[in-house]
A protein has these predicted regions:
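N-proximal low-complexity "stem/linker" segments adjacent to membrane-targeting elements
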Residues: 1-24
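Short aromatic/hydrophobic "clamp" motif used to bind/position activated sugar donors
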Residues: 82
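Short, flexible, basic/aromatic active-site loop/helix in glycosyltransferases
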Residues: 131-168
């Protein structure tokens, strides 16, 4: 059986579609609980959710952040498997059955990711590698976008088409199917990360303890992408950069952390703004400046 954790924040109809994909067809028979953690949403998303014996809703009085909200859900998970699922994701007809079958047949990994299709049905990049300081330079300078096979991206494996199954460093938290028992080995998400990088940090700790993550190209789900944070672009960039620096400070040497900090503050904003100017996207330049102002104010 599977416990499913969904963190909601102003997800509108996305949340309803997500829940409907779980309780329809062949998926519901494998579900123990659907745990929805709401981070003080101001929209109507929760009011759309039907009453169902397997649905548990926890409403936070303030936005606790993604990591903390996930942990609230993880604490309630007692089934053999736990699925962390984004509210802007949807299961296909046999997704849960196929995940359980894959876990039990291969029986050599702790975390499973699947092919995530966007709204147009195209495969999206959903796996990442553990980053290194030099790869952050490749990203900050734009080299990884120009020639990703030569200058390997720091995180997202854009140099791989995701059309084959393989072991990976990390699968995206939008769909993260896990052995519930791993929480006893390595704990939950690190709540220092308000949002972003929490699943990367989790996967790194898993790997350090002998665990593995696996990507199955044969199992599919839908992920619209961006969720509600795509509507707050400056804040989204700020939170991403903030979590990047937290991750670097936690996992890199002092020199490595300082190098990532230099790339983040001095190289990346120039690269971003030059590319935006070349595209004539001047509105986005404002978002970049706002994000860095927030980063400086928060003493990253």
């Amino acid at each position: 059986m599977v416990d499913i954790v969904i963190v909601n924040w102003n997800s509108n109809e996305y949340l309803l579609k997500c829940v409907q994909s779980i309780i329809r067809d062949n998926n519901e028979q494998y579900v123990n609980k659907i745990i929805i953690i709401d981070n003080n949403s101001s929209d109507y998303s929760l009011s759309l959710i039907p009453k169902h014996p397997k649905i548990i809703i926890i409403q936070n009085k303030q936005n606790q952040g993604f990591s903390r909200a996930c942990n609230q859900g993880f604490e309630l998970c007692k089934a053999s498997y736990t699925l962390l699922l984004n509210p802007d994701a949807q299961l296909m007809n046999n997704t849960l059955h196929e995940c359980i079958y894959c876990m039990e047949q291969i029986n050599a990994f702790d975390v499973l990711g699947v092919t995530l299709l966007n709204d147009e049905g195209k495969i999206t990049c959903s796996c990442s590698r553990f980053p290194s300081p030099i790869r952050y330079f490749y990203d900050a300078s734009g080299l990884s976008k120009v020639a990703p096979r030569v200058f390997t991206p720091a995180l997202l494996m854009t140099d791989w088409d995701h059309k084959t199954s393989r072991y990976v460093d990390q699968v995206m938290g939008a769909f993260m199917f896990m052995q519930t028992s791993i929480f006893e080995k390595i704990g939950f998400f690190d709540e220092q990360f308000f949002v972003y990088y929490e699943e990367l940090d989790f996967s790194r700790r898993l790997f350090a303890n002998g665990g593995k993550s696996y990507f199955s190209s044969n199992i599919k789900a839908i992920h619209s992408g961006g969720g509600t944070t795509k509507n707050v672009k400056a804040t989204r960039l700020f939170l991403n950069l903030q979590s990047r620096l937290l991750y670097a400070k936690k996992h890199f040497s002092g020199g490595g952390y300082n190098f990532v900090k230099f790339c983040t503050f001095f190289i990346e904003p120039i690269t971003r703004n030059v590319l935006l100017m070349l595209r004539g996207n001047f509105r986005e330049i404002k978002n970049v400046f706002q994000a860095y102002i927030l980063l400086i104010k928060n003493k990253a």
